[in-house]
């Protein structure tokens, strides 16, 4: 078996690795940092307005800036003037809303494919790092039946390490109430910003859509990452399949041949309905399979961020 770490050392971009290889590289901070560095390398920076490799706690000195805030230590290291940047100067406030319900712990092939929560955590950490490097502030809320972890939006290098530390130990457990988490978040957000939902959307559909519309009505930009396992798109190559709901423990045994085409059509219809319900309301919606490189999701995020200026 090839060593994925060796591939990265030979110059392969980590953001283009499949999640199976990526999961062998190390912990969440290392992986997210490697993914983002590879992604930035691929951007060539110039097409992306406002992108900066510096963290939010510093920015380049501009004529008229208060000289009291020049960081002289940084000047000594880089021979360039930088001023200390405070939280209220950041461009955007963003909130990552992470689904940690029991269904997120599922993988169609646990021996080779990371589960949905692993993917969502690493995507969240990668987006958080990009946000902070752009001078934005970012917070996180994790939920199942209720919000179980919350961090207020802040900028700066330390915030990213704290985000990674807080989401790393979260396990997939409990049922899902995205609607409750979204409404609670809307009530707590004091300024308009960007809300990014990362979920498998095994939720009450109508309630969740109403809550997402509620956020848009209050002036927030919303981006939904629908995290799905490729095994949820297609039935396995077997004569029978056992359907199991990890949140209710209900089971159903069926003949695969009898329902394969119908199942595929039902899945595509369900994904299409999410798209048709959300996009006309100004809510960006992206389906992300857990066997795909994280760079695909990062591109979707960057498209959204560029539109916000």
What are these regions (language model features)?
Residues 236-262:
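Acidic, Ser/Thr-rich peripheral helices and adjacent loops at domain boundaries
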Residues 220-228:
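Aromatic-lined glycan-binding groove of carbohydrate-active enzymes
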Residues 135-136, 219, 282:
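Glycine-centered short loops/turns at secondary-structure junctions
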Residues 159-193, 205-206, 228-229, 233:
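Von Willebrand factor
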Residues 1-155, 194-198, 204, 210, ...:
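An amphipathic, basic-hydrophobic helix/alpha-beta surface used to engage anionic
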Residues 273-304:
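Conserved, well-ordered alpha-helix/loop/beta-strand core segments that scaffold catalytic motifs
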Residues 149-166, 303-304:
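Short, electropositive alpha-helical surface patch
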Residues 182-186, 190, 194-198, 202-207, ...:
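C-terminal functional segments of enzyme domains
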């Amino acid at each position: 078996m090839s060593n994925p770490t060796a591939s990265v050392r030979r110059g392969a971009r980590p953001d283009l690795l499949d999640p199976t290889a990526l999961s062998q590289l190390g912990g969440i901070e290392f992986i997210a940092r490697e993914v983002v560095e590879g992604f930035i390398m691929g951007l060539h920076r110039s097409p992306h307005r406002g992108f900066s490799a510096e963290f939010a706690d510093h920015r380049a000195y501009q004529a008229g800036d208060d000289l009291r805030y020049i960081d002289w230590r940084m000047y000594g290291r880089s021979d360039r003037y930088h001023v200390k940047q405070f939280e209220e100067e950041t461009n955007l406030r963003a909130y990552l809303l992470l689904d940690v319900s029991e269904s997120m712990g599922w993988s169609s092939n646990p021996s080779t494919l990371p589960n949905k929560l692993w993917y969502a955590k690493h995507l969240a950490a990668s987006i958080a790092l990009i946000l902070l490097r752009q001078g934005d502030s970012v917070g996180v809320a994790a939920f199942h039946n209720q919000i179980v972890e919350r961090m207020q939006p802040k900028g700066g290098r330390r915030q990213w390490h704290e985000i990674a530390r807080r989401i790393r130990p979260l396990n997939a457990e409990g049922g899902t109430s995205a609607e409750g988490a979204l409404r609670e978040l809307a009530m707590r957000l004091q300024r308009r910003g960007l809300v990014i939902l990362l979920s498998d959307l095994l939720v009450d559909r109508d309630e969740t859509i109403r809550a997402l519309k509620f956020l848009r009505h209050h002036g927030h930009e919303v981006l939904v990452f629908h995290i799905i396992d490729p095994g949820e798109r297609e039935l396995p190559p077997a004569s029978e399949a056992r359907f199991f709901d990890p949140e209710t423990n209900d089971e159903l045994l069926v003949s695969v041949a009898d329902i394969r085409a119908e199942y595929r059509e039902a899945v595509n219809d369900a994904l299409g309905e999410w798209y048709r319900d959300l996009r006309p309301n100004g809510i960006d919606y992206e389906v992300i399979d857990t066997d795909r490189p994280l760079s695909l999701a990062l591109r979707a995020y960057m498209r959204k961020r560029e539109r916000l200026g």
